[in-house]
């Protein structure tokens, strides 16, 4: 099979000149190293075996060492002999079915190795980039008037890879049994260029030139490129401006690069017990486990499609643990990833062979991690005892499963809810070929065990009619007779509204039965996500770890509304809500609503990261305002569509304040402030307070300016913890004050800024550490810095004393000055007092910037990045906490961190990558390496830059921040008083 390639430049009078220079064999035959490595792994299975073929040729088939290779090679010989003048016909040794089987296998191999197959994660497209750039260079020569006429010849594979990069919309290259229609013998691609010689003079600019593409003498259409209705030659067809094509292909290249990142992500990180240096330092029990999932999902989608090794929806038990040896099924999960909470509204399906087992513990079957393939868009595993391979891909509300059987027999698919209260419901619908049901959701923390007022509705839909089915003990099953090589396709979907929502979600997200198409659409969602932050480095392991962290930071908050915008009203009112946003044509649009905000964790880094890079962040913030309007109070820790009062603080207010100050779009700022103000100034009545509404211990806080030890804060999941609450309320008050200032609420601003100094009431002037205090003003005089105490949340006094993010200079003064402050910071690390496994410590490494010692931040942060984040299942120091731990890594690896999220300042750490792009903002780190971690100097847009912080305005702009890195600290850079972060209390 040959490729001919030509370029034509045609003027308005239709005279043409061939202008293409020879595509050298080097360009045509080029295979990138990653493509070569990938192609070695590609070995698509055949539907038929080789037993009949080998038995027909040999009396003793057991003597054949590699029967599959022999059969394949003889087929290749038979094909080659068509061109030889011999009467010998090797095809006679094959049956028609075997010839077709091998033909389809070869076509699939071609597609996997050179086409747009999801499995290759864009490696073929990336391999074609150099060829495309060579073509562009040739075109540029022609546009400048440097004309030559040549012919180019090559093989089919470079053309196929080039087509994969171009992505023509009218090719069905996923039809692997029709590959010869895409790239037949003598396949050719032509690019015909047009310009008007009466109006345009050479050299021509790209926007002055029109181009059309001809594949095998037929026009092809490029997706997402605007086509002219009529070409310069007066004919209808697909004509494009050359500059639009250039922009389109560069986006395709960027997407292919992002797709390559997906292939490197280890989705198992955090699914096993921690193996980091922080292990057993201060954590206990499940705190020393990442509690993550190797889930398939759409970024911030509703449902996480995950393998399951643990049944039920018990608190602190994740659906999957890497250390488990048996698989129970595949779950449509709403687990609060990375925490010690619980799943809700979930269901599980499990494929079985020959033996019907209903209970999760009975149907659990062995599996090997070597047989697992896990990516953000795809999960697959072989189950040897079930004689099948299970594959899964999914989107926000719906997923598709493909079960391929390795022998003849009876196949079962078992479906159950994961309701621990025995309230789940399942049924079979033979008209829709589905199993459906619902799983009632219950509250925890406040109102523990009460119904939340909504269900997790679901359906499992089969492509083929049910041959047999049944229900027993709350478990439903469907059965099919299968032969070796057969596939059973299943779709599943969820809704928190009703069954109509389930079926609409399926229709909207997966209206067909094309597994690879569904997977490709999920890949597209991830490419868009990963492209918002692009990094490049010679250290490929660091890049993989970075994008793995970004993956884990993309679970929560989750989409809560259906595709039609409907969702159950917050706090159990049982109303169904919907927020219209106009129409596109006749299609109505609805605002997506989000749920499950692990607020004590994510206001620190995850939500600030989202405000920088994630367009959906504004919708997340507006969802908090919705909760206020629907429930009457701004929630403290909104999960399970309920008030919870889990953890401490009032950080929904802090998060909304950051969004207001940083001018988030499509946010009702006045209504948001109304919600924040109510939490900051009002005390909930007894009934509302018991239900989880309002700040905990607010009466004491307003009366004393701190929460005394006398107030045990009983109406909360975390009782006591008075000092930590005071410190966090002081920050929340500061944050709300900034929102008040931005909105012109001057009286509120003055009151709240005074309250922002309340942290001083719990720093003992005698010890200069945080300490418990009684209502009469007397101190507890605690001297234990390293043991957990009741008045501190999930940590020690040494951890929490540093939590004054809005008044670091005030804390410095309270500790006795800059030197004592710096010495205590040193001690945090030299005496192993620092614990990265939980949130209260995570801003501490960046506090060196305030004392003019940024090189220590650089060293501490680099150590944490390297040691506390490992690309292995036990690679997280503690709970990932809805992605907060991973968001810390993302921001810190980029080179900055928001010590005070509501402020416009981000403290510079140590950049990890040669180059990073955050939207339009660029960070370059010259000479960065494992040794060169220290900043020697910096420039911003070419001008010297000595501040040890950057601003939100810089991050949202199009500037370039460049660092020169070295192996030794430069104690001059960023150390002067004027280079340190501003005092936020002035």
Where are these regions (language model features)?
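Extended hydrophobic/aromatic segments used for targeting, binding, or gating
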Residues: 120-200, 569-583, 594-597, 767-791, ...
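Accessory carbohydrate-recognition regions in carbohydrate-active enzymes
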Residues: 258-654, 660-727, 738-761, 767, ...
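Short strand-turn-strand beta-turns centered on an Asx-Gly dipeptide
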Residues: 216, 940-943
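Signature for phosphate-centric chemistry
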Residues: 1-150, 154-257
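Short, low-complexity Ser/Thr-rich regulatory SLiMs
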Residues: 193-204, 394, 405-407, 925-929
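Beta-strand signatures of extracellular beta-sandwich domains
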Residues: 212, 937-939
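ATP-dependent phospho-/nucleotidyl transfer catalytic cores
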Residues: 732
């Amino acid at each position: 099979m040959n490729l001919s390639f030509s370029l034509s430049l045609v003027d308005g009078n239709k005279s043409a000149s061939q202008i293409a220079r020879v595509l050298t064999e080097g360009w045509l035959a080029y295979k990138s190293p990653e493509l070569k490595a990938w192609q070695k792994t590609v070995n698509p299975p055949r539907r038929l075996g080789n037993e009949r073929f080998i038995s027909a040729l040999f009396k003793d088939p057991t003597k054949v060492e590699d029967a599959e290779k022999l059969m394949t090679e003889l087929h290749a010989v038979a094909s080659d002999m068509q061109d030889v003048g011999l009467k010998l016909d090797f095809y006679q040794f094959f049956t028609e079915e075997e010839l077709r089987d091998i033909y389809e296998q070869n076509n699939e191999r071609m597609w996997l190795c050179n086409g747009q197959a999801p499995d290759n994660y864009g490696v073929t497209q990336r391999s074609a980039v150099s060829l495309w750039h060579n073509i562009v260079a040739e075109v540029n020569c022609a546009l400048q008037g440097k004309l030559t006429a040549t012919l180019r010849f090559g093989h089919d594979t470079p053309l196929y890879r080039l087509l994969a990069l171009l992505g023509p919309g009218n090719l069905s290259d996923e039809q692997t049994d029709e590959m010869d229609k895409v790239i037949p013998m003598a396949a050719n691609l032509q690019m015909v260029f047009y310009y008007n010689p009466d109006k345009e003079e050479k050299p021509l600019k790209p926007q002055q030139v029109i181009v059309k593409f001809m594949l095998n003498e037929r026009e092809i259409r490029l997706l997402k490129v605007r086509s002219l209705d009529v070409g310069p030659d007066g004919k209808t067809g697909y004509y494009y401006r050359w500059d639009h094509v250039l922009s389109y292909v560069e986006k395709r290249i960027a997407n292919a690069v992002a797709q390559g990142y997906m292939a490197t992500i280890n989705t198992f990180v955090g699914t096993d017990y921690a193996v980091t240096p922080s292990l057993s330092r201060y954590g206990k029990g499940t705190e020393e486990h990442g509690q993550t999932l190797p889930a398939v999902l759409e970024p911030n989608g509703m449902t996480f499609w995950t393998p399951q090794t643990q049944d039920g929806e018990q608190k602190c038990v994740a659906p999957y643990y890497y250390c488990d040896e048996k698989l129970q099924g595949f779950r449509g999960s709403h687990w609060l990833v990375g925490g010690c909470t619980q799943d809700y509204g979930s269901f599980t399906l499990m494929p079985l062979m020959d033996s019907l087992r209903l209970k999760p513990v009975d149907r659990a079957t062995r599996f090997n991690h070597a047989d697992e393939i896990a990516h953000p868009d795809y999960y697959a595993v072989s189950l040897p005892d079930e004689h099948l391979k299970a594959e899964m891909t999914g989107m926000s509300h719906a997923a598709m499963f493909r079960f391929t059987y390795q022998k003849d027999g009876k196949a079962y698919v078992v479906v159950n809810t994961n309701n621990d209260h025995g309230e789940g419901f399942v049924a079979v619908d033979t008209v829709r070929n589905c199993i459906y049901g619902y799983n009632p959701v219950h509250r925890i923390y406040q109102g523990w065990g009460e119904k939340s007022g909504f269900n997790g509705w679901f359906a499992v839909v089969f492509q083929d009619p049910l041959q047999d089915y049944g229900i027993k003990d709350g478990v439903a099953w469907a059965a099919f007779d299968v032969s070796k090589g057969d596939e059973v396709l299943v779709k599943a979907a969820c809704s928190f509204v009703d069954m109509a929502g389930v079926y609409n979600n399926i229709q909207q997200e997966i209206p067909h039965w094309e597994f690879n198409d569904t997977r490709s659409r999920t890949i597209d969602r991830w490419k868009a996500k990963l492209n918002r932050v692009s990094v490049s480095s010679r250290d490929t392991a660091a890049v993989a770890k970075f994008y793995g962290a970004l993956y884990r930071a993309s679970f929560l908050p989750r989409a809560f509304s259906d595709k039609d915008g409907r969702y159950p009203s917050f706090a159990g009112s049982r109303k169904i809500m919907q927020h219209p946003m106009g129409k596109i044509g006749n299609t109505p649009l609805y605002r997506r609503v989000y749920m499950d905000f692990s607020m004590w964790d994510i206001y620190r880094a995850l939500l600030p990261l989202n405000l920088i890079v994630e367009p959906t962040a504004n919708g997340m913030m507006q969802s908090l305002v919705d909760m206020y309007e629907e429930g009457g109070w701004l929630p403290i820790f909104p999960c399970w569509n309920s008030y919870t009062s889990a953890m401490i603080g009032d950080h929904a207010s802090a998060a909304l304040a950051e969004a207001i100050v940083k001018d988030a779009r499509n946010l009702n700022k006045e209504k948001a402030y109304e919600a924040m103000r109510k939490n900051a100034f009002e005390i909930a009545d007894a009934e509302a307070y018991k239900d989880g509404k309002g700040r905990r211990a607010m009466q004491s806080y307003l009366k004393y300016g701190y929460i005394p030890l006398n107030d045990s804060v009983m109406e909360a999941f975390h009782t006591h913890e008075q000092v930590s609450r005071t410190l966090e309320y002081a920050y929340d008050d500061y944050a709300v004050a900034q929102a008040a200032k931005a909105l012109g609420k001057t009286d509120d601003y003055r009151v709240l800024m005074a309250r922002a100094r309340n942290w001083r009431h719990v720093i003992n002037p005698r010890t200069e550490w945080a300490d418990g205090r009684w209502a009469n003003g007397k101190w507890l005089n605690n001297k234990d810095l390293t043991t957990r105490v009741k008045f501190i949340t999930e940590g020690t006094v040494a951890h929490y004393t540093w939590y004054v993010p809005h008044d670091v200079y005030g804390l410095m003064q309270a500790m006795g000055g800059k030197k004592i402050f710096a010495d205590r910071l040193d001690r945090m690390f030299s005496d192993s007092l620092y614990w990265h496994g939980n949130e209260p410590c995570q801003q501490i490494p960046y506090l060196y910037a305030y004392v003019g010692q940024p090189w220590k931040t650089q060293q501490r942060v680099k150590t944490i990045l390297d040691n506390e984040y490992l690309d292995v299942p036990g690679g997280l120091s503690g709970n990932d906490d809805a992605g907060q731990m991973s968001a810390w890594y993302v921001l810190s690896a980029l080179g900055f961190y928001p010590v005070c999220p509501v402020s416009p300042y981000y403290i510079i750490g140590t950049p990890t990558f040669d180059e990073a792009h955050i939207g339009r903002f660029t960070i370059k780190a010259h000479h960065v390496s494992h040794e060169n971690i220290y900043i020697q100097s910096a420039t911003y847009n070419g001008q010297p830059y000595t501040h040890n912080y950057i601003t939100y305005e810089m991050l949202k702009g199009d500037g370039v921040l460049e660092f020169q890195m070295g192996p030794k600290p430069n104690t001059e850079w960023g150390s002067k008083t004027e280079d340190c972060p501003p005092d936020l209390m002035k």
